[in-house]
């Protein structure tokens, strides 16, 4: 976690005036996840209104809220991606500029061993890769962290037994994944 934080800290030094776009992207992504989990909550309420308490008007109202929350989630995701892409494009531009400025200070012997086209390609390719990483990973990381946490909260809010069941299945899944990884690594070592 520290390495990711320090990586973003270093990258954001190239766009100090655009940091707000990173935080906006994070906030919008978090709001999108909350909207998504809210849709699940109202879907649950709608199902209860249909099957347990025959209250069809409430079920219809809850279904409309589900649709509205899913539309809101889409809008928030687009806004989050827009903010992170704006930051990514600015970062890409500034990285290219910074790389070219550093080249001006390079000795002439450096250019004897490396062609200018190769150097330019390396700078452009790495700046583009950094843009992709920043533009997509900022909202994706927030979603990847918040979704399971809010899913646990939602399950316990619906029924504590569902929450316990979700915890048990998660633990079993993690244990199976670890065992599968150990077997995969052992078979790779045998082949080598």
Question: Residue ranges of each PLM-predicted region?
Answer:
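A short amphipathic helical element positioned immediately N-terminal to and/or at the very start
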Residues: 3-22, 118-119, 123
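Transmembrane helix-loop-helix hairpins at lipid-water interfaces of multipass membrane proteins
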Residues: 16, 22-79, 156-161
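Residue-level hotspots within the lipid-embedded alpha helices of multi-pass solute transporters
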Residues: 30-37, 70-74, 86-90, 106, ...
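Hydrophobic/aromatic residues in alpha-helical transmembrane segments
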Residues: 39-47, 64, 80, 84, ...
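Cytoplasmic coupling helices
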Residues: 82-101, 142-143, 166-191
């Amino acid at each position: 976690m520290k390495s990711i934080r320090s990586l973003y800290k270093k990258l954001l030094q190239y766009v100090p005036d655009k940091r707000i776009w990173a935080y906006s992207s994070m906030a919008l992504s978090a709001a999108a996840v909350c909207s998504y989990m809210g849709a699940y909550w109202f879907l649950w309420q709608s199902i209860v209104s249909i099957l347990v308490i025959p209250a069809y008007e409430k079920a219809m109202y809850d279904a409309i809220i589900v649709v509205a929350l899913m539309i809101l989630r889409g809008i928030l995701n687009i806004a989050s991606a827009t903010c992170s892409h704006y930051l990514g494009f600015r970062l890409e531009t500034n990285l290219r500029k910074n790389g070219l400025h550093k080249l001006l200070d390079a000795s002439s012997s450096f250019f004897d061993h490396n062609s200018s086209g190769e150097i330019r390609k390396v700078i452009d390719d790495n700046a583009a890769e950094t843009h992709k990483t920043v533009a997509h990973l900022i909202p994706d990381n927030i979603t990847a962290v918040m979704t399971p946490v809010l899913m646990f909260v939602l399950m316990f809010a619906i029924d504590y037994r569902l929450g316990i069941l979700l915890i048990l299945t998660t633990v079993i899944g993690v244990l199976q994944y670890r065992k599968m990884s150990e077997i995969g690594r052992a078979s790779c070592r045998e082949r080598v």
